């Protein structure tokens, strides 16, 4: 069979780091300095090189795409967006998958590779870690996996505070980018572009506002509105 087993130490990722909090902070950090990243080619190259080296080291030590699952800030961002996808790969009959002993969809077969995303397609119930490559459909000997359409935004269940915070961080960053990059105000733009202007005090203020809005103000506002909605809905 075409197994995707890789070399390395194959250690388990630490459970206490298995939530999205690390990715959330890395994503927020990268976006806070994004104006610098896109205007300084040397810094852009250094960040990309650091990510590649980190991915190689983590892959050599840990198993199951640990870098993508638990460290890569962009993967967390993509996983939230995938919940709004209009298509999904799912079993036709979950009972047949439960009776299957080979699980070729995950481990591979003579006809196709195992899941390159290293999930078990027979147990998929959300899109967050599925890349829709459809390799599992070719691998399944029982033809029990399919791709199907679904209503937009039908998979919006948040399974933890870390996922909820990531969604709120994304909203806060949209507001921040609108003000600093698209708005008519020159002062906030100069704060974010510290390497051109040299206003480090303004940049620190910019970062403080963005982080406070993303981690405190917006979650507090969302929580307050949720409580009001619950109160008035009975």
Where are each of the predicted segments found?
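Cysteine-cluster motifs in flexible loop/terminal segments that predominantly coordinate metals
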Residues: 91-140, 144
